[in-house]
Design a protein with these regions (language model features):
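Non-heme Fe(II)-dependent double-stranded beta-helix
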Residues: 1-17, 23-131, 137, 177
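Short, structured patches in soluble enzyme cores that scaffold and shape functional sites
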Residues: 117, 133, 150-154, 166
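Double-stranded beta-helix
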Residues: 155-207
Length: 207
């Protein structure tokens, strides 16, 4: 995909919806390598890791003695785990796409904060992450940050793919619409109407 075609199509979707999908960006050999490393780290429980029981989200085990308490949620610190992940994060094509989306020619930096991880979805005990804006995790003066999500496997409705509310990145909801954990309160009518606009983002490996 050329820089110009990305600028014409995906960048417009990004500005309008707050996200965009670049299909078939990563070849099979490369995402296969990343998936193999991630699977190996999962099987060996290589720290740092986060378990579902640690977060207590809906659907997660209640405590460490409950069934499913050993269900993994995330492999943390992906950037430091293996050179393959670092090379992916610093890939020139990733940089070109981000520069286009952010409409900048300045140097870009990789943040190793919250989203520096490998997400997993295990059958039975994977929890539901409630509705939120990613900025809830970031304590920065400027909001010119973009999360890059690479699918290492098929992601669809059957296995808990990502869901988004298009255009919600332009909203600035009153603090009263969030709970103490900065999730949208589903009991409020104004939030219900917003959540009803949600769509699923199904991905293929390499998207």
């Amino acid at each position: 995909m050329s820089f110009s075609s990305l600028n014409d199509i995906e960048a417009a979707a990004f500005e309008r919806d707050g996200y965009t999908v670049v299909r078939n960006m990563v070849p099979a050999q490369r995402f296969g390598e990343l998936r193999t490393i991630a699977t190996d780290h999962l099987s060996q429980l290589i720290a740092p890791i986060e378990f579902e029981v640690d977060v207590g989200y809906p659907g997660a085990p209640v405590d460490v003695s409950s069934p499913g308490a050993d269900t993994l949620r995330r492999l943390l610190q992906a950037f430091a785990r293996d050179e393959a992940f670092r090379l992916w994060a610093l890939d020139p094509e990733v940089k070109r796409i981000l520069a286009c989306l952010l409409q900048t020619e300045e140097d870009l930096s990789v943040s190793q904060c919250h989203h520096n991880c490998i997400m997993t979805k295990a059958p039975g005990f994977s929890s539901v992450t409630l509705w939120h804006q990613d900025s809830r995790y970031w304590a920065f003066d400027y909001e010119n940050l973009v999360s890059v999500w690479l699918a290492l496997g098929k992601e669809d409705k059957t296995n808990g793919c990502l869901r988004v509310i298009p255009g919600s990145h332009k909203l600035d909801p009153d603090s009263g619409r969030f709970d103490a954990a900065m999730f949208l309160r589903p009991d409020l009518s104004e939030n219900k109407s917003l959540i009803e606009q949600a769509i699923t983002v199904e991905l293929n490996p390499g998207d």
